[in-house]
Amino acid sequence: MKRNFWLLIIIVVLSCSRRDKLHDRIMKEQEMISFLVELHTIQSQVQNLRLPADSSEILFIVLEKDLLSKMNVRDSTFYESFSWYLDHTDMMYDIYSAVVDSLSLRNSLVRKVEE
């Protein structure tokens, strides 16, 4: 019984430290917001080209890799961060609220310039 108790304690401690390490590896909220704003902008630009689906997908992947490189983010870091924020829905809601606000502001500025 004592052995099982200590084994349980060790598992709990290791899982907590693993979670903390994961949290240290994820992108900060502001980094995530900036990245997602740019990513959605790229996605919109690719869709507006009206290319065949396979060509659009290839172009999007290339542009996404360029964005990752430009922002100095590894793809695994982005995907891990995105997954982490999906598990923390209140934070993801705040992130996407900021993304939508930023994209709306960009859109209104572009419309003003076009007028």
Where is each model-derived feature located?
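Short hydrophobic/aromatic-rich motifs at helix boundaries and adjacent loops
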Residues: 4, 35-39, 51
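Sec-dependent signal peptide recognition
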Residues: 2-9
